Amino acid sequence: MNQVDATRKRPPGIVKRWGWRILAILQAALLILVGLAAVAVASRYGGRWLPFLLAGAAGWVLAQVLKAGLSLPLAANPATAAAMVSSVWFPVFAAVLPALAEELGKYVPLRWMRVQAREQALALGLGAGAIEAVFLALPLLLNPVAGTTTLVGMLISVWERSWAVTLHAGMATLDGFAACARRGRWLLAAMAAHFLADLPAGQYQRLVALRAPGVVTWLVIAEILVPLLALAALALGRGLWRKAGAAPGPAQ
């Protein structure tokens, strides 16, 4: 998922001196919570979760490779990059590419591994969300200057990552149901949820690059919409799996 960057300005005081450390600690705490959630799944459902957790992380990495292969040739050309950002269609492009690549990055391993339970899909989603959080937090650990931020920016970052992991888990339950029941419309539903989650972030990034008004409005929309989509995806996925049983068969 796209990251909304609310960490632009370095203020004086304790946040100036310790901001990157605090944010790194909060990011680490978030990863610990994800790990505890995985342990909770493991304690209830045995070792069946671990391959899916690892597959989720691997699928996310492969999705980033695919995204880079498609977008870097355009971004590497300054003229093309400037034209893309200035276009009103930039948010759509910035949302469509992650939605397609990352949801296929969940669906393909779920289909290949023959997912049979919602908890397996949840584990895969947690793996994808956790590795994404690691990649976004890594620059803070390697380059403290890159992590300087305001206290509000730190809280927004942790809020966003928490709900992004939750959304990954929710979308994975839809992908898993689509893979298990051979009902592709739920894969499309997961892609649609991912697209809607990234669309405001793309518009936010565009307005920041253009120094145009409306930045705060789109930031607020992004931070509200992601939790709503995460809760909706989790509820829908749970309902689908519960209605069909633990291992729904292919549609006739």
What positions do the PLM features span?
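Hydrophobic alpha-helical segments at protein termini of multi-pass membrane proteins
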Residues: 2-252
